[in-house]
């Protein structure tokens, strides 16, 4: 009972096909692909926005003859 045989997987496949139908599975996979694509697009947009951000800073002048 510890491992699944080919018959277990065939029964699971038949149950999934009966529950969702033949037309619903490709639609679900398309929705998953669109979600992944939008997630990747959002990540690249966020990285581009953070790279464009400028930070105001002060210039610190040091004397060249000072020794620390």
From Swiss-Prot:
Lineage: superkingdom = Bacteria
In alphabetical order, the GO MF annotations are:
protein transmembrane transporter activity
Asked if the Swiss-Prot or TrEMBL record annotates the protein with the keyword Membrane, the reply is yes
According to the record, the residues making up region (Disordered) are 46-68
Give the bilayer topology: Single-pass membrane protein
Residue ranges under compositional bias (Basic and acidic residues)? 53-68
Q: Which InterPro entries match?
A: TatA/B/E (IPR003369), TatA/E (IPR006312)
* Entry-linked HAMAP family: TatA_E (MF_00236)
Q: What does this protein do?
A: Part of the twin-arginine translocation (Tat) system that transports large folded proteins containing a characteristic twin-arginine motif in their signal peptide across membranes. TatA could form the protein-conducting channel of the Tat system.
The name under which this protein is listed is Sec-independent protein translocase protein TatA
């Amino acid at each position: 009972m510890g491992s699944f045989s080919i018959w277990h997987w065939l029964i699971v496949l038949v149950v999934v096909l009966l529950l969702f139908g033949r037309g619903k599975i490709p639609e679900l996979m398309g929705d998953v692909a669109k979600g992944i694509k939008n997630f990747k697009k959002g990540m690249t947009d966020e990285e581009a926005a953070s790279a464009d951000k400028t930070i105001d800073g002060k210039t610190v002048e040091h004397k060249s003859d000072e020794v620390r």
